[in-house]
Amino acid sequence: MRCVVYSIAKSSPLELVKIYQKQCKQFGCELELVDLFPKNIANAQKISKELAQKSYSLAFEPYLNPKAINIALHPKAERGDSFAFSKMLENYLNINFFIAGAYGFEEKFLKDCQAWSLSEMTFSHEVAKIVLCEQIYRALSIIFRHPYHK
C-alpha cells in the first residue's frame, strides 16, 4: 500500500510525522508527504481567492491518479469515525490525499476526488498533516487488528 499526502505548503517533515511513517511500514504501507508551493501560488494568493484555488488545482492535477483513490480534505465534506475511515481505505493500494492552501479547493478539483473531512474545526497544515498521518496509522491498525486502536 502507498499513501501520499500532497499539500500546498512550504515545508514538512515534522518529527511526529516521521514516527507515523515508520509505524505504517510495519503494515506494508509507505506513507509519503509531498509539499508543493510553486511561485505561481504565492502570486495568485495575493490577487484573488479564485486565482489561488486555480493555482492549487494546477499544482495538484499532475498527481491525480485514476488507478488510486484521490481524497481531498475539505471541511464541509463527509466525515466519520476511525472505523469509517479505515473502511474507506482498506480496499485500495494507492491512496492520494490532497490538502489545499488557505483558500480551499476549486469545485472542479473536488469533482475529481472523493472529499473527506477530518473535523469541523480548521487546522493549520502542520496539524492537519499530523492528524491525517495518525489516522492513516490508526486505520491500518484497525484493518490489521493491531492493538493500537482499542
From Swiss-Prot:
CDD domains recorded: RlmH-like
Transmembrane residue ranges: none
Lineage top rank: taxon: Bacteria
Signal sequence range: none
Pfam family, one: SPOUT_MTase
One of the record's GO molecular function terms: rRNA (pseudouridine-N3-)-methyltransferase activity
Subunit: Homodimer.
Function: Specifically methylates the pseudouridine at position 1915 (m3Psi1915) in 23S rRNA.
Name the UniProt record assigns to this protein: Ribosomal RNA large subunit methyltransferase H
Source species: Helicobacter acinonychis (strain Sheeba)
